[in-house]
């Protein structure tokens, strides 16, 4: 398990000790619940911590004020009794009164909570996990409004020392979710919340530290730093993705052919295999992603433009689709532009988009029909893939407009390639080089890598520069052969496939 000591220390010093009320809102399975659980242990010496989970409350508990107040008081008292037995004597009378009468509302509940906080021998920290469970209920918004009121008056009226809410939605978007009319979208009932900016992703150092502990127990002989960096390259530190890859490697890979030895499992090849296993599973995180993409079509269209067209979209968290993508953990800011949060998300989304489009795609069908001829002795003949793609693309789309090809050309190639490598290989788009004119695709097939540059052709000078860039990129990957697919709109273009030599590099170039 990745150590959270540094994160817990930061939260305590920057927020809890300073009496802050705040929200930890991150994407699904981003370590929120784990952080709250560990933070509770970390705070117990100085504070009384009441940690609640709103998933314990059903929708019936939010039907009205009285029902919610009674349910909240009940879960609060049970949690306090279970976890703070040593403090119970001094607080017993306040606890007894907290449940109140059946017809008491939120105002009466907060009066009793104030008395409880006044009687407490130590400051009380309130944590509420899964606040999204309450997000469609007006009574919860009113609960937040009273928290805000007591927070502002706490110099005169005792109340919680610190309040921590955790969920996917931030408070502003809880309001948006409840009342989507434009005039109400941004009226937060809880604008006293401190901004929570602590990075909850795992760094390469944290991943390495976890692998080091594993290595001390199992002696696999792995390259710890190299493995940590490779895992980070796929996940960007998204907690559940890091832990899932490691779990597949620990539990599932040793049962597969070629991975009988632990040194084979804990290798870059093992990571690639674990990633492939992860992408083939319907994990809750992926299910949630599909659901949100269906709900927010503009966000989905933006992701398609980024991945398929290499479109550069300026980063602005005020833009609704970008804000939602950040909140769900699907997007991030990168050099002033919007980017998909990590490589695994990119691979999953590409698989999803292509699977949906493959049903009606002529290019996918062409790749599927002739897929077997591209495999020779267990190796993928990428030059032949290029030759056949040029043939099929010219037959189907040769007379299409420049705008149509510029927008869709790269998507057609990826649709063509997918059935050829499906089940055996995989590919991802290199974010470092993705732009409106140039995109690099890296294909993995049975341990062999192919670097493919997809490029919109804009004259000889630009083309020669693209060839040089690809040669430099091959140096980075320590490879001598690369592939260049140019979508050329010059009427005098020479359609076909040829080989170009730059220094000791061979570039197979296809022009369509």
Locate predicted features:
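Active-site metal-binding core of divalent-cation-utilizing nuclease and nuclease-like domains
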Residues: 416-447
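Conserved catalytic segments around the Walker B and adjacent sensor/switch elements
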Residues: 23, 44-63
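Nucleic-acid nuclease catalytic cores
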Residues: 463-467, 474-502
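Walker A/P-loop-proximal flanking segment of P-loop NTPase domains
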Residues: 1-42, 112-116
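Conserved NTP-binding/hydrolysis module of P-loop NTPases
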Residues: 49-50, 62-89
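Conserved Walker B catalytic segment
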Residues: 99-170, 177-184, 464-471
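Winged-helix-like regulatory helical subdomains adjacent to P-loop NTPase cores
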Residues: 203-328, 334-335, 363-375
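Conserved catalytic cores of phosphodiester-cleaving nucleases, focusing on short active-site segments
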Residues: 413, 441-443, 447-458, 473
């Amino acid at each position: 398990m990745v150590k959270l000591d540094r994160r817990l220390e930061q939260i305590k010093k920057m927020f809890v000790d300073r009496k802050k009320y705040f929200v930890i809102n991150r994407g699904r399975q981003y370590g929120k619940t784990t952080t709250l659980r560990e933070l509770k242990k970390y705070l117990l010496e100085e504070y009384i911590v009441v940690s609640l989970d709103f998933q314990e409350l059903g929708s019936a508990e939010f039907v009205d004020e009285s029902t919610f107040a009674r349910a909240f008081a009940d879960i609060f008292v049970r949690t306090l009794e279970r976890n703070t037995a040593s403090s119970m004597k001094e607080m017993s009378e306040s606890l007894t009164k907290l449940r109140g009468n059946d017809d008491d509302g939120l105002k009466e509940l907060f009066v009793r909570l104030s008395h409880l906080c006044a009687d407490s021998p130590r400051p009380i920290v309130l944590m509420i996990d899964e606040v999204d469970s309450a997000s469609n209920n007006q009574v919860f918004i009113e609960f937040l409004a009273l928290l805000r009121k007591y927070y502002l008056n706490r110099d005169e009226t005792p109340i919680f020392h610190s309040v921590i809410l955790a969920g996917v939605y931030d408070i502003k978007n809880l309001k948006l979710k409840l009342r989507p009319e434009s005039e109400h979208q941004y009226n937060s009932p809880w604008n006293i919340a401190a901004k929570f900016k602590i990075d909850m992703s795992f760094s390469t150092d944290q991943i390495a530290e976890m692998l080091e502990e594993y290595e001390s127990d199992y002696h696999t002989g792995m390259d710890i730093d190299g493995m940590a960096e490779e895992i980070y390259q796929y996940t960007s530190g998204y907690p559940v993705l890091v832990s899932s890859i490691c779990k597949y490697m620990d539990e599932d890979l040793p049962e597969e052919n070629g991975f009988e030895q632990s040194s084979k499992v804990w290798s870059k090849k093992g990571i690639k295999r674990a990633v492939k296993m992860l992408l083939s599973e319907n994990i809750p995180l992926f299910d949630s992603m599909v659901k949100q993409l269906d709900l927010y079509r503009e966000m989905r269209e933006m992701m398609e433009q980024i991945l398929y067209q290499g479109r550069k979209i300026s980063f602005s968290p005020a833009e609704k689709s970008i804000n939602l993508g950040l909140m769900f953990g699907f997007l991030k800011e990168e050099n002033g532009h919007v980017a998909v949060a990590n490589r695994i998300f990119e691979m999953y989304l590409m698989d999803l988009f292509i699977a949906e489009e493959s049903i009606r795609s002529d290019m996918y069908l062409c790749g599927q029909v002739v897929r077997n001829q591209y495999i020779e002795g267990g190796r993928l003949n990428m030059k032949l893939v290029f030759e056949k793609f040029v043939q099929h693309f010219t037959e189907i789309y040769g007379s299409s407009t420049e705008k149509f090809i510029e927008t869709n050309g790269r998507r057609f190639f990826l649709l063509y390639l997918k059935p050829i490598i499906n089940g055996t290989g995989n590919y991802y788009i290199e974010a470092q080089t993705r732009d409106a004119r140039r995109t690099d695709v890296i294909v993995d097939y049975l341990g062999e890598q192919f670097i493919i540059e997809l490029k919109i052709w804009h004259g000889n000078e630009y083309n020669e520069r693209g060839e040089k860039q690809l040669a430099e990129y091959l140096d980075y990957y320590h490879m001598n052969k690369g592939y260049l697919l140019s979508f050329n709109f010059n009427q005098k273009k020479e359609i076909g496939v040829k080989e170009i030599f730059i220094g000791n590099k061979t570039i197979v170039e296809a022009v369509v």
